[in-house]
Structure formats: C-alpha cells, structure tokens
C-alpha cells in the first residue's frame, strides 16, 4: 500500500471541494493560478483593514466584503491599466478606488507577480447592472469583470448567455455570490466553479 501524507490528502480534498469543472481538472496554467492564488487565497493584505472599514461604514453585507477583498486581490495580482466601478448600489466600491489604484502595477514585464505577456494589460471592472455589462462587452479585451450576482440573478443569467454566445470569451468562474470573467482572445472558453 502506498503511503500518502496527511498534507497531501488534505490538499487533494481541498482541490476536490473548491474546484469543479464537470469532472475535469484545470488545464490552463493561467486559470490554475487565478483559482489558487487569487480566488481561493486566504492570505491577509495590509489593505484589508481599510477595506473592511469602508464596507462596514456603508453598512454592506459579508458577501460585499468578500467581493471587495477579491477585487483588491485581482488589482494586486494582474497588470491593470484602468479600474472602473459601473452601476448603481456600488458606492462602497467607488470609495475603495484610490486604495485599489495604489495596489496596481501597469507594467506586465515588471509586475511583482509576473512577468506577464505584454498583451495581458487588463482593464478591471466591477459591474452591478445589465446595461453596464452590455456596454463593457463591446470594448476590446483583455478585461477582468467581477459581476456580483447574489442580489441580481438576471445579471448572472445574462453573463452566462453572453459567454455561451461568444460575446465574452475567456475564463468564467462561477462564485457563490458573483461571476468572475477574464475576457481575453488568448483564452478559449473555460468554465469553473468555486464553492468557497
């Protein structure tokens, strides 16, 4: 009988619990890094205390706090040329923009988590309305879209439909409270689900 350490078994269990891809593994190195180092990351950043203060001051929920943390991790981990918050009921995210802009590095080759290919200079969007989503998909990629759907199921359906129609191409991650889309011609359509 082969020996497996308890750490290896725990990692395998976490992998099976966190990432579901219709019974298949994550084959894209970019998607694997996105899932493990950004979406599922548990490390605390020094900016999280400031983010928590802003979210609580606006009386937002725990789901909004998790999305704000994820939005910050996305800004910190990828080369970002611009950040926009689009839609109503996102005043807390508007207040976080200066903090997010301090975290970005717009140079793919010099990025602390890189280097990234030159074509991976993303626009980062937080979208809360269908009209804003329709407007953004007309812009040229690459873009990272974080779309909170826990209060607006029709926005989730619209995002999935745009991905199936090919209007949004790239990686789509179904989160419990949001849709995360990495729209880039570099990636073929990939769909994942994170349960954490």
Name what the model sees in each region.
Residues 1-124, 130-141, 151-196:
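A short alpha-helical cap/connector motif
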Residues 145-148:
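Short beta-strand/loop segment that forms part of the nucleotide-sugar
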């Amino acid at each position: 009988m082969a020996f497996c350490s308890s750490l290896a078994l725990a990692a395998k269990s976490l992998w099976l619990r966190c990432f579901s891809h219709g019974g298949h593994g994550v084959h894209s190195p970019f998607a694997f890094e996105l899932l493990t180092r950004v979406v599922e990351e548990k490390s605390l950043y020094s900016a999280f205390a400031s983010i928590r203060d802003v979210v609580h001051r606006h009386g937002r929920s725990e789901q909004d706090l998790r999305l704000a943390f994820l939005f910050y991790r996305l800004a910190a981990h990828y080369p970002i040329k611009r950040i926009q918050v689009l839609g109503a009921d996102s005043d807390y995210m508007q207040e976080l923009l200066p903090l997010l802009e301090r975290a970005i590095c717009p140079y793919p080759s010099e990025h602390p988590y890189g280097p990234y290919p030159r074509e991976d200079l993303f626009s980062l969007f937080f979208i809360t309305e269908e009209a804003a989503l329709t407007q953004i998909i007309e812009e040229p990629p690459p873009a990272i879209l974080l779309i909170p759907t826990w209060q607006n199921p029709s926005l989730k359906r619209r995002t999935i439909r745009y991905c199936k129609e090919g209007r949004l191409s790239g990686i789509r991650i179904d989160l419990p409270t949001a849709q995360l889309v990495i729209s880039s011609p570099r990636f073929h359509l990939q769909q994942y689900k994170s349960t954490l």
